[in-house]
Regions:
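Radical SAM enzyme [4Fe-4S]-AdoMet core and its adjacent flexible, acidic
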Residues: 2, 7-41, 45-46, 50-57, ...
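N-terminal [4Fe-4S]-dependent radical SAM core
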Residues: 74-204
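Amphipathic alpha-helical segments that form well-ordered structural scaffolds
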Residues: 104, 273, 335, 339, ...
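Conserved alpha-helical substructure of the radical SAM core
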Residues: 145, 151-153, 158, 162, ...
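A short acidic, helix-capping loop that chelates divalent metal ions and anchors anionic groups
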Residues: 224-226, 317-323, 389-392
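Flexible, glycine- and charge-enriched loops at secondary-structure boundaries
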Residues: 225-233, 323-330, 398
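Radical SAM/AdoMet-radical enzyme domain recognition
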Residues: 237-255, 264-383
Length: 542
């Protein structure tokens, strides 16, 4: 029983090998451009997959009986402040609508910041006085979800949260629950903004406010604030060291940002230090200019430990990048992508989407990424946030240019014709159950817990794709895997805290019962599915 998962994979491999052996003695007849034996082989493999899937569906209820009759006890990892949590022990924010929430008056926020810069108030005023905070109502209007709020000083504000109420309802429903409640320390004391659960998954360190571009929009208003703010080496080291002291001590991806982080004199040194102290992933949010200018700089960054280039990318031609004020910026991006990929740095296309400016580029950018899937890992579309250089935007322009997560889901379908908004999209936090599974499988003695994104479901969404790099074709994972159900299955498996061999067997069973052989790509085999899942959970299954 301890090797049951291995047996399932080997059954598939042996079945394939037997078919190959038989094919050696087959007559080859052309059938629509393919050999008859190849057709028979593929058909046999699909039959074998269906048998395994059917067997898994029969076994699954039996495993659930075992889990109800006998459950193990959760342990407390040394990186965590408490024993591992079951779903029933997790807490949830308030969802649905109408509901009230805490918000900010955009005018008050600006006034408070200016008073601190002028020396009229200390920065601790932000922590102790909660300036600019007001209540807001989240309601549905004409099928849209909007936030409505009133400031006694500056009047009424209204903004769109979603253009599709059913979409937002689905996203909130899939939230898996909060992580550990975080112990309060002086490092976490940020007033109302204090992270109260978990610890986040990305530590963003702004190395400098200098930049070699003049973008519009710019979240940071780089180069325009009238002074240079650049972290000294002691500051960088202190931030990275302090982050390691916070529990739960989960792994994080450190993202160096700015301004343009590559302009910092400590950029390479900071990357090296991250790897030395144990951060497993280091990325840079960059416009790519320095990497385009110098392949040697890209190599130096890779050698230091840079894993991901979070590359600003607004469209697939120079015209779509004109708001960045560089006429040939797309050509620069192509050179940066080539240089980064050549040395082994993963490239993520990061697109700030502004409604009526570049929202038509969503489909072309996805297609560009698919066509260059040997160089590009994934796309990150970021709906515009009116901060920094754009905080003085008029209410009329804000409504005109507002772009929400629901806009993105519908634009992907409209511009690619492939995905389904109410099936293929998930909150980023939906990956939490897989992190919980990995935490259990890795045992109590790990120095770090698994990376876990616990952000609010209104914060970010994602869609998993299966890409055929040879044919440049793609499918959403939900087309051939019941992702909604497998997430629930993983929660049930982890909550049972069974012996590891039984947990592994149940995970393989869950993968099989949620696999749809008839809709999967022809090249996709069950053993590939198991191996990919194992890779995504940090090798917890092997």
């Amino acid at each position: 029983m301890a090797v049951a998962k291995k047996d399932l994979v080997e059954m598939q491999e042996e079945f394939e090998e037997s078919k190959v052996e038989k094919a050696k003695h087959s007559f080859y007849l052309p059938v629509k451009g393919k050999m008859a034996s190849e057709k028979l082989e593929q058909g046999g493999l699909k039959i074998g997959e269906r048998l395994l899937v059917g067997t898994a569906k029969v076994l699954w209820p039996l495993f659930q009986v075992i889990n109800k009759v006998h459950q193990g006890k959760p342990f407390q990892p040394k990186w965590a402040p408490a024993p591992l949590l079951k779903k029933k022990e997790k807490t949830f924010p308030e969802f649905g609508w109408p509901r009230k929430t805490d918000s900010l008056c955009p005018r008050c926020v600006k006034e408070v910041r200016e008073s601190i810069i002028a020396g009229e108030k200390d920065f601790t005023h932000l922590i102790n006085a909660n300036p600019g905070e007001i209540k807001a109502n989240i309601v549905e209007k004409n099928g849209k979800i909007v936030m409505v709020k009133t400031c006694e000083k500056h009047g009424d504000f209204e903004d769109t949260m979603a253009i599709d109420a059913k979409f937002l309802q689905r996203i909130e429903k899939l939230y898996p629950g909060r992580d550990f409640k975080s112990p309060m320390t002086h490092l976490r004391n940020h007033g109302t903004s204090t992270i109260k659960y978990g610890r986040g998954s990305v530590l963003t360190v702004d190395l400098t406010n200098r930049c070699n571009m003049m973008c519009d929009p710019c979240f940071m208003d780089a180069n325009q604030v009238g002074y240079v703010h650049e972290l000294a080496w002691e500051d960088i080291k202190e931030i990275l060291d302090n982050s390691l002291k916070i529990k739960p001590r989960r792994q994080m991806s450190v993202q160096f940002s700015g301004g343009e982080p590559t302009l910092s004199p400590y950029f390479i040194q900071a990357i090296k230090y991250c790897k030395e102290v144990g951060y497993f992933s280091v990325q840079a949010a960059t416009n790519g200019i320095r990497f385009a200018e110098s392949p040697e700089f890209a190599q130096e960054a890779y050698d230091a430990g840079l894993r991901i280039a979070y590359l600003q990318f607004d469209g697939v031609d120079n015209a779509s990048n004109q708001h960045r004020k560089i006429s040939n910026l797309f050509d620069v991006k192509l050179r940066a992508i080539t240089n980064l990929a050549h040395v082994g740095i993963d490239v993520v296309l990061v697109t700030t989407i502004v409604n009526s400016v570049n929202d038509h580029q969503v489909g072309p950018i996805i297609d560009f990424a698919i066509q260059n899937s040997d160089k590009i890992t994934f796309c990150s579309f970021q709906p515009v946030s009116f901060t920094g250089r754009d905080e003085d935007i008029s209410d009329e322009d804000r409504q005109k240019h507002r772009y929400t997560l629901s806009h993105l889901a519908h634009d992907v379908k409209k511009q690619t014709g492939v995905s389904e908004p109410l099936r293929d999209w998930f909150p980023l936090s939906a990956a939490g159950p897989f992190s919980d599974l990995t935490d259990y499988m890795m045992g109590p003695d790990q120095d770090f817990g698994n990376l876990k994104c616990g952000c609010h479901p209104n914060c970010g969404i994602g869609m998993g794709l299966m890409v055929d790099k040879s044919k440049k074709a793609w499918l959403p994972l939900s087309e051939f895997i019941n992702v909604d159900r497998i997430m629930k299955d993983v929660v049930d498996i982890t909550d049972a805290f069974q012996p590891k061999w039984l947990t592994k067997l149940q995970v393989v069973c869950a993968l099989l019962r949620n696999f749809k052989p008839g809709k999967a790509p022809k090249e996709m085999k069950l053993k590939d599915l198991v191996r990919k899942f194992d890779k995504q959970t940090g090798g917890s299954m092997t």
